[in-house]
């Protein structure tokens, strides 16, 4: 499928701070593409550039074949954008919000509005209530309805499940997959690693740069590591000794996680570091997506897989 988004050397600076740093991305049409990283990684700034809200400081970005710097007016009717704040008018009902957004796109047929409300699961009661009166999960679905009301070819979702409970998060991702199945390209930002694994491909971002890009399973495999989960007594000493030798060792409660080269015998490899403690359990597992993200941050080896 042809590319929905292509960037080359894309950069955005705010004074002396570089929020987006020479990004090269190629996102295929119809993909569910994740931008993953901690707060301050540059995800929201990148989305706002691709939506033609911010202009690049350098480099270029083409969205649906249009240059974001010179073709913003032609681009905006073709895309949808759901911000972290949900961008709804609190004093208006959901229906009034949808009608308002519909007018921005030259009017939306009543049938289309009904179909969208049905897609996101908005009830008649919810549609009639003011946004300020609604729980977060319903506001989230109303914001998605407003973003897709005009039938965009590409939709940007900026941390759409922030503050939403696990059930609401699961249902929302089912909606994302429905949109993708109909051919809509979805670009979503998140710092929740479990959500990132639902994407077709993800770009791992930190400090405005892309550290790696590819399918989640490929990125986990690209680390070339296994994870040893260790319980030892005394655990404080075990953690201190392992962390000194194996950077990236983490502690969760009293359980220690350490990344080792794939194919290694963890007991032999860790024997020296654990010689002064009693090892109660060593369990070896594949790296989680969170483990992979931490590994890429520490090693900063770019891995870029095409769409």
Segments from the language model and where they lie:
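Conserved ABC ATPase signature
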Residues: 91, 130-137
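Catalytic Walker B motif of ABC-type/P-loop ATPase nucleotide-binding domains
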Residues: 155-159
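Short, charged/small-residue-rich alpha-helical element at the C-terminal edge
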Residues: 225-300
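Conserved ABC ATPase "signature" region
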Residues: 99, 110-126
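ABC ATPase "signature
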Residues: 213-214
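Conserved ABC transporter NBD signature motif
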Residues: 59-67, 74-75
